[in-house]
Amino acid sequence: MSDWLYRFFCDVVSPLLFTKDGKHLSPPQIFGKNGSKPATFWIQPPEPVVSLTSHQFDPTILYRPRVFLWLPHFLVKDLMCPNCKKQILEKNGACPPRRIVDIEDSFYVVTWTYYCRKGCQSHFRGWTPSLLDSLPPYLRLAFPAVLSRRSGLSHRVLTQLRVGNQHKMGPSGVRSLLFELHTHRFNVLQAQYVEAVFEVVRGRQEMVDSSQQSLHAYISSSVPPFGDFSDVDKYAGFVPSENYLTQMMNKAIEHDEHDANQHTSCLAPDQLAIDDSHKVSHLLLSD
């Protein structure tokens, strides 16, 4: 994790996770329990135009990702252990954020670790499949991603994989599409940043001698470069490999196998098997 991203989680995300009402943790303000703002699970990045209009030339503001706060213990009366199903899970600290690849960028999921202290003494993370399956369906369906061992894909990317596979565009084509969309978003942010800097340059150019030759003389030395798409210390753009997309698509299909089989069994049969028992007597006579 780059330094700017680490500071972002420390300064912005961490205070929301550890909001207290007296001695006890309370739901984050973005959950909208007080009714002052619309409730949401998402921490949205600032609008680039707002910071650029005020000439805040800090690329890390434009790099900021979306963050999904998954805190199910605030959304159910009792968070029960999915193993023993008898004891209430206790909070056991926040998990490291997990990066999820979406259609045109990546976002992060942040959750808690839970511990069944009085029961089976098992540990669970908020995105553990068994814990997700134990939640009410309406709450479980709000989780936005399917996770792998270290990363994950959003449901929107998986839907794109399914639809692409149905229309003869496999994981290779979907990866090319994701790369195009991710780099396009980066290019738009970069263009906004550069155009805002040039606006300052043009404004200063009118105030200096027309004999000035170098553009760099108009730009403050404190304006940092925007960086490259794949620079891990800056924007850190990322698109998964074709093999990873294939594995995740197969994982999603296997997860839905039971429902697919149940759906197939409910369909009206178009053709029934033909009874070939009359051939048995013919075979016996031939022997």
What are these regions (language model features)?
Residues 1-80:
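N-terminal alpha-helical interaction blocks
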Residues 77, 112-113, 268-272:
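Core residues of folded domains in eukaryotic genome-function proteins
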